[in-house]
């Protein structure tokens, strides 16, 4: 099962993702978190399954599209993650539209949380700040 969270409001997106993780966890699962700072070998190992004893896991993949090697492996593994019994959570704070659409195509749940746009400062001091 694949869950996808994205958007510029990272605090809200993370909060909603953590709520969903808490909802589906039964207490005995191990949480595996892979970020762009991990190695490709770590990511590959997380795709292999629960190991010798069939340990149930929740896998969180965070910001992998920032790392070029991991990005390629992520896109090649989407179908495998979609069919998996283990829940996979993908959190991408900022990703391009093509990557977002590709991940959404395989996701059972897609959630986007964008921060409200800030109004442009039209005050008299804006000119002084520009100098």
Each language-model region and where it sits:
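Non-catalytic interfacial helical region
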Residues: 2-131
